[in-house]
């Protein structure tokens, strides 16, 4: 069963300031938590289009929301194709868009998907199981320098070089086939005192490989820019991030689009192309409450930012 505890549920959807007859997009359907709450606030004229690249998530949502008929449309696609897929549906503007950038718990908890360092499984980590690049390819074929870069940039791993050296030495003798093998190599690359602090020693490297396999940061950056263009004036965008790099992309994109650039003094009016596109609804990110953190440990790194189209 596709179960998933939704993070910052009400804050994210209520932050969109739902119009009951509006058209909305959930870019990250997952277990359907945000979609379910959003659909419950729509009248017959309202519509929700939900994206996911996971076939199981799509089928689950079609069953779960079948009573909504044509009000709910599930699109099996990466949200990097947000504009194209909406245009195919004849939709050129919407009233609100939400992103929840966490990996859905069913993906983490399904051992054979290879996302988890708690289960031994083939090295996969693809959110779209038809995509060509896998974690196996990254771990076995990428150069030492490439591995160091992603471990450091995407995982903020202090021992990136040591871990990459262990991987490089091991794969000269034998291909690294499973998550279990990779976990052991990561542990060998981290000094014993450091292994005992800061959660599971493989956490940061697994995150880095997952981001690389799915090209997550570039995809999000492009999709957020597209969302700003698609949302109507007065419409809103809600974004939940779980990683400092994702949050930085969201923060800087929102800030850049909500401020007026420095213009030559004495201009009688601000040219239209220089007027800010957005108004920030959240100056600082909204964080999960203590109650939510007690109920769902995976929410601990979540941050919610909301902006409104001018």
From Swiss-Prot:
EC number: 2.1.1.199
InterPro entries in the cross-refs: RsmH, SAM-dep_MeTrfase_MraW_recog, SAM-dependent_MTases_sf
UniProtKB keywords: Cytoplasm, Methyltransferase, rRNA processing, S-adenosyl-L-methionine, Transferase
Species whose genome carries this gene: Bacillus cytotoxicus (strain DSM 22905 / CIP 110041 / 391-98 / NVH 391-98)
Name of the molecule in the record: Ribosomal RNA small subunit methyltransferase H
Role played: Specifically methylates the N4 position of cytidine in position 1402 (C1402) of 16S rRNA.
Gene name as annotated: rsmH
Location of the protein in the cell: Cytoplasm
Highest taxon in the source lineage: Bacteria
Enzyme class: transferase
Catalysed reaction, written as an equation: cytidine(1402) in 16S rRNA + S-adenosyl-L-methionine = N(4)-methylcytidine(1402) in 16S rRNA + S-adenosyl-L-homocysteine + H(+)
GO biological process, one term: rRNA base methylation
HAMAP family per record: 16SrRNA_methyltr_H
SUPFAM superfamilies in the record: Putative methyltransferase TM0872, insert domain, S-adenosyl-L-methionine-dependent methyltransferases
Family assignment from sequence similarity: Belongs to the methyltransferase superfamily. RsmH family.
Entry-linked Pfam families: Methyltransf_5
Residues holding S-adenosyl-L-methionine: 32-34, 52, 79, 100, 107
Annotated S-S bridges: none
Gene Ontology molecular function, alphabetical: rRNA (cytosine-N4-)-methyltransferase activity
Gene3D superfamilies associated with the record: Putative methyltransferase TM0872, insert domain (1.10.150.170), Vaccinia Virus protein VP39 (3.40.50.150)
Example of a GO cellular component annotation carried by this entry: cytoplasm
């Amino acid at each position: 069963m596709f179960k998933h505890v939704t993070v910052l549920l009400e804050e994210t959807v209520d932050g969109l300031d739902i119009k009951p007859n509006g058209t909305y997009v959930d870019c990250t359907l997952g277990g359907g938590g945000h979609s379910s709450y959003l659909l419950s606030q729509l009248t017959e004229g309202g519509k929700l289009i939900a994206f996911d690249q996971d076939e199981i998530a799509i089928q689950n949502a079609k069953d779960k929301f079948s009573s909504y008929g044509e009000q709910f449309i599930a699109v099996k696609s990466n949200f990097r194709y947000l504009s194209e897929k909406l245009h195919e549906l004849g939709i050129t503007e919407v009233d609100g868009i939400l992103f929840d950038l966490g990996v859905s718990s069913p993906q983490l908890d399904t051992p054979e998907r290879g996302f988890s360092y708690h289960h031994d499984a083939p090295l996969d980590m693809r959110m779209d199981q038809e995509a060509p690049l896998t974690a196996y390819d990254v771990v076995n074929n990428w150069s030492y320098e490439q591995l160091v870069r992603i471990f450091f940039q995407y995982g903020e791993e202090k021992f990136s070089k040591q871990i990459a050296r262990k991987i490089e030495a091991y794969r000269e003798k034998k291909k690294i086939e499973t998550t279990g093998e990779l976990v052991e190599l990561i542990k060998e690359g981290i000094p014993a005192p450091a292994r005992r602090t800061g959660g599971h020693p493989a956490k940061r490297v697994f995150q880095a490989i997952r981001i690389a396999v799915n090209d997550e940061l570039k995809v999000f950056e492009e999709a957020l820019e597209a969302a700003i263009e698609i949302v109507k004036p007065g419409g809103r965008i809600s974004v939940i991030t779980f990683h400092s790099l994702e949050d930085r992309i969201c923060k800087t994109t929102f800030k850049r689009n909500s401020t007026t650039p420095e213009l030559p003094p004495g201009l009688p009016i601000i040219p239209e192309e220089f007027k800010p596109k957005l108004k920030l609804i959240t100056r600082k990110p909204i964080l999960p409450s203590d109650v939510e953190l007690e109920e769902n440990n995976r929410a601990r790194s979540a941050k919610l930012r909301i902006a409104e189209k001018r």
